[in-house]
Amino acid sequence: MLRLACLAPLAILIPAAGTAEQARPADDALAALGAQLFVDPALSRNATQSCATCHDPARAFTDPREGKAGLAVSVGDDGQSHGDRNTPTLGYAALVPAFHRDANGKYKGGQFWDGRADDLKQQAGQPMLNPVEMAMPDRAAVAARLRDDPAYRTGFEALFGKGVLDDPERAFDAAAEALAAYQATGEFSPFDSKYDRVMRGEEKFTPLEEFGYTVFITWNCRLCHMQRKQGVAERETFTNFEYHNIGLPVNETAREASGLGADHVDHGLLARPGIEDPAQSGRFKVPSLRNVAVTGPYMHNGVFTDLRTAILFYNKYTSRRPEAKINPETGAPWGEPEVARNLSLAELQSGLMLDDGRVDALVAFLETLTDRRYEPLLEESRAAQKD
C-alpha cells in the first residue's frame, strides 16, 4: 500500500493568519487539506510526482528540473514523457477570472495557457489525469489512492461527509476543491514584492528601476500587462487576462522532446473545447509578470532563456534596424511564427524600439515584481543569464 505523508507538516505550508493577504477567502481546514495534496506524489501513477514537483514552492511555483529540453518543458511521472508548453507559475493564479467572453467579444481568463480550465478548481484536477503529467488513469484511481491513507479518509470526511472517498466523482471533485483552496491562500499571492512596498510608501525605487517603471507604463507593455489602460490597479496582476498571438517561433528542442512531431501545430486558444473560430488560432493567455525575473524560460513554449531576449523579441515589430531581427541567444534571425495569421499587430506595432538602456531599465523594474521570499533567486538568475 502506498503510504502518504502525514498531516503534521501542514503548519509550515499554510501562512499564519494575518501574515499575507489572501487572493480570496479560503477555509483554513480545506486549504490545509489542499496543501497536503499539493506535495503528495501518491496522486501520480508511479507515485513519483506531486503538484509541487512541477510547481515548486521554493522556485516561485515553477519547475526547476531539467529534461531533454532543459527547463523549457516539464518531465512527466514516467520520467520520459515531456510536455510541449512551459509550466506556468501558480503564483497569483487565484486572481485570474473564470474563462469568459467580455462585452467586446474578447476571450479572457481561465487557467492554463489556452484557458481550457474555466477556473482554479478545474485546473487543479486536470494534471492528475493528464497522460504526460501525473498520468492517473481515471478518477477512480485517484479516489483509491486517497482511500489508502486513513488520515485522508478522516480529513475528507470531516469536510465533505462520510463516504466521500468511496464515490470517485465526489472524491475527485473534493480533492480539486481542496487544491484550489490552497492555491487561493496568501502563500501564492502575497503582494509583498518591492513594487508593492514602493506603492505602499515603504520603500523607493532606484533611479534605474524608476526609469524602467516609466518605460513600462509609457511603452506598449501596459496594453497587455496591466489590468487598466491608465493608472495602477490595487493588487495589480500585470496581465489583462486576454489571449494574443505574438508570433512566437516553435521551440524545436521542446517539440522534439514532446514527441509530437515536426508537423504538429500548437493552436493555443483554438484547441480549447468549444472554441471553433479560426481567428483564435495561435493565441495564448497573457501571463502575469509577477516573479517573471525568476521564472524563466519564457513564453508559452519556453523558447527564450533570458528575460532580456523575451523583451528584445518585441523589437522585431517596432524597428527596421538589422539588430532587431536577430535573436541574441542564437545569433540567427528570429524564427518564423508557428501560427502566422491572427497576429496581434495593433498591440505589437504600437510601441517604439527599446534601446539597450531602456531594456536594462525594464529588466530592473521587472525584478521589483519578485515576491520577497524569492528575492534571493534574483542573483542566481542574473548569474545564470551571464553564463
UniProtKB/Swiss-Prot annotation:
GO terms for molecular function: cytochrome-c peroxidase activity; electron transfer activity; heme binding; metal ion binding. GO terms for cellular component: periplasmic space. It is found in: Periplasm. Its EC number is 1.-.-.-. It comes from Paracoccus denitrificans (strain Pd 1222). Its main location: periplasm. InterPro entries: Cyt_c-like_dom, Cyt_c-like_dom_sf, Cytochrome_c_Peroxidase/MauG, Di-haem_cyt_c_peroxidsae, MauG/Cytc_peroxidase. It holds the Pfam family CCP_MauG. This is Methylamine utilization protein MauG. Heme c 1 binds at residues 51, 54-55, 300. Involved in methylamine metabolism. Essential for the maturation of the beta subunit of MADH, presumably via a step in the biosynthesis of tryptophan tryptophylquinone (TTQ), the cofactor of MADH. Residues 1-20 form the signal peptide. SUPFAM superfamilies: Cytochrome c. Heme c 2 binds at residues 221, 224-225. Pathway: One-carbon metabolism; methylamine degradation. Keywords: Electron transport, Heme, Iron, Metal-binding, Oxidoreductase, Periplasm, Plasmid, Signal, Transport. Binds 2 heme c groups covalently per subunit.
